[in-house]
Amino acid sequence: MRRKVALAFIGLFTLILISRSVSAEVDGDRLVREAVEYYRGLASISVVEMVIHRPTWERKMVIKAWTRGVSDSLFVIVAPRKDFGNGTLKKGREMWTYNPKINRVIKIPPSMMAQSWMGSDFSNNDLAKSDSILTDYVHRVVATEEHEGKKVYVVESIPKPEAPVVWGKQILKIREDAILLVEEFYDEDMKVVKRLSGYDIQMMGGKLFPKRWKMEKIGREGEYTLLEYKRLEFLDDLPEWIFTLQFLRNPKRL
């Protein structure tokens, strides 16, 4: 009996040492930055189908998106026709939305960046996969896993003091080739609220990329949003005039 207890203690102690070793050897900040930069590339143009699913209804839309660096993004709905032209521009730490029916641009304050985008389970920050996760959080590797024969780093992301975020923490699972597999969002009581999962990894835009993404609400069965990339092109750069209010308002941009 004593021998079993001793072996169990040794095993637990070994796991603790391994965990500390992983945390010491791998820079969590670097991992997260590489994952965000891999996801967005230097610049990109994409067409994405979004499906908002609820227990009693489902809504579909098609979005065209432009991104540049880790902070500039433009998203415009191209279908269905009734929503055509609704857009969101994020440039640096500022964000605007445009409604063509009333021809009005509204500036979104940082405190509202976590609000739902077009009624989906994605927030404005989620959809843009913006630099908030880089600038507002401190990251550390807490464990490792395996996915399709590749090492996966489990990263705990804690908000910096006074950061304008609503989450108590985030947990990210990043594959060794910089592909983000999972992002979990925790409230201030450290209970997981929603989970983003990337899957169906295949060649897109010249590199391996999850073609499909699912954002689901924990504990609310049947409530989730799916994203499927229909087209994805990574570029070296995009012109400045794309990320302007004039382009956001201009229906000829598509």
For every predicted segment, state its role.
Residues 1-4:
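Positively charged n-region of N-terminal signal peptides that target proteins for export
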Residues 45-82:
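N-terminal, post-signal-peptide region of Sec/Tat-exported proteins
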